[in-house]
């Protein structure tokens, strides 16, 4: 009795010294022997390694060049803003040589549009990253043609009425939106990220 109490006292005070549980075997007549083993739970540290593949420089350059198409075509909407704030034109002086070269080519806008759509968007040899950026730029360029069509249809006139002021506000808003999309697309492409322009990205994604 004393030895039993001593063994129980050692087990309670030092659990590590307690004997390990042995598997319990149950044998039934005419059947196999079942062995029940105690489950041991061990805390395992899960290490998640995030694989990151940087975007190649060529894909970034093509994406940046794609967003230049709608931006160049949207400069015509900024004429009222530049006339009211001439100093804003100084910010765009570095791109004037490229813009003059772009406008010196006959039908440069149509050539760039179809070249970008057929040569990049529909070219499966390019990655989805490049094709999506190109399609988003093409979609934005198509949307930029809508204000011109509305202006020709409505014909606000040359006076200082409400129609003319509405056209000026609309053109200025279109230019600001296009400029923000251009900056957003260029910065995202430089960082190797995918820019998602509201409404435009959904329409571009459905075309791929």
From Swiss-Prot:
Belongs to the Tic20 family. GO terms for cellular component: chloroplast; chloroplast envelope; chloroplast inner membrane; cytosol; plastid. The keyword Lipoprotein does not apply. It is a multi-pass membrane protein. One of its GO terms (biological process) is protein transport. Disruption phenotype: No visible phenotype. Expressed in leaves, siliques and roots. The chain crosses the membrane at residues 61-83, 101-121, 134-154, 172-192. May be involved in protein precursor import into chloroplasts. Not redundant with TIC20-I, TIC20-IV or TIC20-V. Part of the Tic complex. This is Protein TIC 20-II, chloroplastic. It comes from the Eukaryota. Disulfide bonds: none annotated. Keywords: Chloroplast, Membrane, Plastid, Plastid inner membrane, Protein transport, Transit peptide, Transmembrane, Transmembrane helix, Transport. Residues 1-49 form a transit peptide. It is found in: Plastid, Chloroplast inner membrane.
């Amino acid at each position: 009795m004393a030895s039993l109490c001593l063994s129980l006292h050692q087990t309670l005070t030092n659990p590590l010294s307690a004997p390990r549980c042995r598997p319990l075997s149950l044998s039934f007549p005419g059947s196999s022997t079942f062995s029940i083993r105690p489950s041991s739970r061990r805390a395992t540290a899960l290490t998640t390694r995030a694989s990151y593949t940087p975007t190649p420089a060529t894909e970034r350059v093509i994406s940046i060049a794609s967003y230049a198409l709608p931006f160049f075509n949207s400069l015509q909407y900024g004429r009222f803003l530049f006339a009211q704030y001439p100093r804003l034109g100084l910010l765009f002086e570095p791109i004037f040589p490229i813009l003059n070269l772009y406008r010196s080519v006959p039908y440069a806008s149509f050539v760039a549009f179809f070249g970008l759509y057929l040569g990049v968007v529909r070219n499966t040899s390019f990655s989805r990253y490049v094709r999506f950026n190109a399609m988003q730029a093409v979609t934005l360029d198509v949307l930029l043609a809508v204000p011109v069509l509305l202006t020709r249809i409505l014909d606000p006139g040359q006076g200082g009425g409400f129609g003319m002021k509405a056209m000026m506000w609309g053109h200025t808003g279109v230019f600001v939106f296009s400029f923000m999309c251009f900056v957003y697309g260029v910065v995202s492409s430089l960082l190797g990220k995918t820019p998602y322009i509201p409404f435009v990205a959904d329409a571009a994604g459905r075309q791929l």
